[in-house]
Amino acid sequence: QTNHKMMISSAKPLAIGLFTFTLIAYICLTNRFLADDFSVSYVANHSNSLLPWYYKITAVWGGHEGSFLLWVLIFSVWTVAVAIFSKGIPEVMVARVLAVLGMVSIGFYLFMLLTSNPFESLLPFYPVDGADLNPLLQDFGMIIHPPMLYMGYVGFSVAFAFAIAALISGQLDST
């Protein structure tokens, strides 16, 4: 029983840690874009030194790797929202929901690390300037569209996690 209590009590801090470290990764990638660090392959392929700062920020999600990092960041925002705003829900249920979200996170992080790493380096040889952001993505709509879309898409993972947690607990009614 003590072991279960430790696992249950560690769910919320782990969710907050997941968000914190994902946010740090996202800020680091955004910083590489703003600093025109073309030694990072993703930056070299989706930005250049003449791109305005606001498009450099949106270039972070201008390709697959950065878009996936944004997806994972928003997923971690939803996860920490469940951890923080679930005060009226039994602690065991919240822990199960966070465990389901954590398992999905592990899958996302493994996919990102193994196939879609946005921090892949071009060292020792890298271009003086980048290839530029796709001109179709240099639009105000692309500044707000992907984050808004992902908030909705990824938000459904919370409903999924609650459904799976209810199935695990056998609690399929309103009690």
What are these regions (language model features)?
Residues Q1-T175:
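Polytopic transmembrane helical bundles with strong interfacial aromatic enrichment
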